[in-house]
């Protein structure tokens, strides 16, 4: 499980359903799919997937490696084969709903995150790309928030 595999799966779902997807759409769908993934795939899988941090940009969060990977398409749809990753099948409905949303509505919504808003001046005026901590990405209920804190604390103990 990784951000690369989630990106591949999102593209696969789009193509399988005869929908086009641009790089900007992919970035926003990556963000929202991971943000709301815990009820569908579980906290552990969401944490494992987040192996590369989102970075702040004027257009909301992006995963740099995946942005660079598809940068050559510009604003054109991403074409070519894509790989299904079955561990993300539970996210397919959400992915399809997000693909049908206006990309600039997704951009605007992604900037409503408290983390982005807190750093807005640095992002807009200085062009800083700041890493999102996982707790700023995942939308968690109180129980999962506590589990995330315990998980992070356990990881720090082993370092």
Predicted regions and their residues:
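Domain-edge interaction signal
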Residues: 1-159
